[in-house]
Each structure stands twice: as structure tokens, then as C-alpha cells.
A protein has these predicted regions:
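Terminal targeting signals and extreme-terminal segments of soluble enzymes
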Residues: 1-263
């Protein structure tokens, strides 16, 4: 089995391993690993500007992402003193497979007044140490995303509606490189629609066509909790909403727009 999601394959290129395999097709990636990889590249582009906080990441999934070599380009659309806007593109097999935008802000300590409504921020239902081990229903003998991450159930149950699941990387996103906090969030956040599914994935497709993550701060530690629910509209559309926590409390939110079809 591979020991990372991606291996560097030259300047601006990464070879995906089988640990990126998703639930819908054995030749396609789960969108979590490439979203994590692009978060890494956006932060690398922002670092020379002194910007380090990934406040927002939006990934528009144009087509299935193959388990193949990926190329990523990042452009600076605007850079100010306190924040910069970036756009990016992910390519594979001579096609653009995803594109998106990101906002990276400058970190600066700020003392807030006591007693603000809604604060202190809420915590996850249970810490990972008190949560039971989880298992994806699409796990199989073939390596895939379910082998890339370890999961623990803090509330509810996987694929049975609203739930809260802790995620921890078993392997790095890029071979030989320590995972960034933003990568830990992105690789987990794309699972919101899966863990909170209310339709049988053997009978229905409910694939997300995008992923937007908004962060108050980076996570601390290895564990990230996704507290998710899935909602469906009347015309083959859906929405997965997630709260994102680390062991200290709420750190952000994520949304996914879903296309729903009978198999």
C-alpha cells in the first residue's frame, strides 16, 4: 500500500496514489485529498507575502478527478496588506478537472471583550478519546480514502443522517512532508455529504460539485471533527452543511452543493 496521498512528480506536478480513491468509481479520487493539496499550494503562494491564515477555500469540481498525475497552478488575483485573493486550476490527463478561489489573511493577535454573544465557541459533542472507532461503508480490500484517514464517531452514525465524525490522517498528503493544519481540514471537510448521507449510496448518487470551507483559525492537533447534515431539494439538488471543530472548539464551517440521481 502507498504511504501518502500524493508523490511529487516534478515542478507543479503530483502523482496520486490509490489512497485517494473515492467511493463512486475505482478510477476516481475522493475530492478531499486534491482539495488538501491545493490548500497547501495556495498557502505556499501566500507565504512570501506574510499571509498564513486560509480564511476561505472554494473548490469547483468540474469533472471526476482521475487517480493520475495532477498539475496545479495558483494565481494571485489581488494582494493587500491584510489579505490576498487567489485563483487556482487543477489539471489531469490534459483536462482541467477543478478550479477555484481562496482568501488568505494576515494573522494578528486581537484581544476581544468578554461576554460576546455566542462565545466562547461551542465544542464538538465528544473529544476523540471518548469517541468510538468509525468505518466507511464503502471501505474494501482495495486501498482508498478510508485507509488514508482514521475516523471516530462523536455523535450519530455514519451514513445514517446528521452526525459528528472525527478525522485524523493516517498518512501524509504529500510523501515526505508533514501535513499542514489546512490540509487536515480540507481532506476531512469533503466527507460531509458522505458521513451524513440519508440515501442508500448503492441506489443513489449524491455527488458534490463543489466544496467551500470558511475557517476562523487553523486546527490545533491531529484531529478534525466534521459535524454534518445533508438536505435535499425537490429537483435533484442537495446541500451538505458541516461545522468544523478541533479539540478546543469550533473553527469553521463547510458547504457542498450536491447533484442527486438514482443509479
Amino acid at each position: 500500500m502507498a504511504d501518502s496521498a500524493f508523490v511529487r512528480a516534478g515542478s507543479g506536478a503530483w502523482r496520486a496514489t490509490r489512497l485517494t480513491r473515492g467511493p463512486w468509481d475505482p478510477g476516481h479520487q475522493h475530492a478531499g485529498p486534491p482539495s488538501a493539496l491545493v490548500a497547501r499550494q495556495v498557502l505556499a503562494a501566500a507565504a512570501p507575502m506574510g499571509l498564513a491564515h486560509l480564511a476561505r477555500l472554494t473548490v469547483n469540481l468540474l469533472r471526476p478527478i482521475p487517480i493520475a498525475e495532477l498539475s496545479i497552478s495558483v494565481n494571485t488575483d489581488y494582494a493587500g496588506r491584510g489579505a490576498a485573493h487567489f485563483s487556482f486550476s487543477i489539471g489531469a490527463q490534459d483536462k482541467e478537472v477543478a478550479r477555484g478561489t481562496a482568501l488568505v489573511q494576515r494573522e494578528a493577535p486581537l484581544a476581544l471583550p468578554e461576554g460576546l454573544p455566542g462565545h466562547p465557541l461551542p465544542k464538538a459533542p465528544k473529544p476523540p478519546a471518548e469517541s468510538s472507532p468509525g468505518q466507511f461503508p464503502f471501505a474494501s480490500k482495495d486501498p482508498g480514502y478510508s485507509d488514508l484517514v482514521e475516523t471516530r464517531v462523536a455523535d450519530g452514525a455514519m451514513f445514517r443522517g446528521p452526525c459528528a465524525i472525527w478525522f485524523r490522517l493516517r498518512h501524509p498528503i504529500v510523501a515526505g512532508e508533514a501535513p499542514l493544519p489546512a490540509e487536515r481540514v480540507a481532506v476531512a471537510a469533503d466527507s460531509g455529504n458522505g458521513i451524513s448521507a440519508i440515501l442508500d449510496f448503492r441506489k443513489y448518487l449524491f455527488v458534490n460539485t463543489d466544496l467551500t470551507i470558511n475557517l476562523l483559525r487553523p486546527p490545533k492537533g491531529e484531529w478534525v471533527c466534521i459535524q454534518a447534515q445533508t438536505l435535499f431539494g425537490p429537483d435533484s439538488s442537495g446541500l451538505a452543511e458541516s461545522r468544523i471543530y478541533d479539540e478546543e472548539g469550533l473553527i469553521g464551517r463547510a458547504t457542498q452543493s450536491l447533484v442527486v440521481r438514482a443509479r
